[in-house]
């Protein structure tokens, strides 16, 4: 049995082999066979001599004398390097000699001269099958069958095509596994980034405390962090000269300690009057309830009971 290695994927997708039919041969690494010079003008006399040499080669081949047949065909090719049939015939003999690389070189030469050479496609397909290049072999053999079908081509296709089918199924399987792996990796990366964002957001917030805000950008950062954690924000506007604010301040601290999932942010309107203007603060203390960056409720004045009720209501939702 011959095997073909599958693509290797990272993680859980491991290398796998396909069990294929047929025996591959070791590639022949002999020096390239003698080829003719296609630029040479061939006389009628040389064509006739080449034909005689080709006939001798075919006779020797029919008698099983492969080396002698190759010698005669080589002589024919040198005499008439424009003969596609001479190259294709020598390619067939190289296939029988189990020299697939030499056969492929001759088949290529034959097909360059005559792109419709059935024997060229046939010998190249058989040679590629010997090397385990099943898909390329099938392509050449199918073309040979289309041009001039014979039983040998049909028999070779019956050996090659099941392997091609196995390779295609194997490729589809591992393409599916690769896609599943990529989806899994993307999801893991998404989760990792989310975890980093949550960690960074959590670090930016102080659970159980009222956070004093000293700049507009700091407020935006805290609001964004709270949104990424889907947490309620109580935005508390105060002022140093405000008596009711001094009364409600300890209440805010107590609520922050009690509702640790709620983010309490404190803004002094004199320090950050642009922020107060942006939020349309008309009096202090004022409390804006914010979720995902949007105001959902509001308490104006030092209404302890109202504030506690609103925090409990929105903080638990």
Swiss-Prot record:
GO MF terms on file? Answer: Hsp70 protein binding
Determine if Hydrolase is one of this entry's keywords.
Answer: no
Bias type Acidic residues, positions: 9-29
Q: What does this protein do?
A: Probable thiol-disulfide oxidoreductase that may participate in various redox reactions and act as chaperone under heat shock. May interact with HSP70 proteins through the TPR repeats.
**Which residues does the entry assign to the active site, renumbered to this chain?**
242, 245
What GO cellular component is one of the record's annotations? histone deacetylase complex
Chain positions of TPR repeats = 50-83, 85-117, 119-151
Q: Does the keyword Repeat apply?
A: yes
Might you name a Gene Ontology BP term for this protein? response to stress
- Taxonomy of the source species: Eukaryota, Viridiplantae, Streptophyta, Embryophyta, Tracheophyta
Q: Which organism is it from?
A: Oryza sativa subsp. japonica
What is the protein named?
TPR repeat-containing thioredoxin TDX
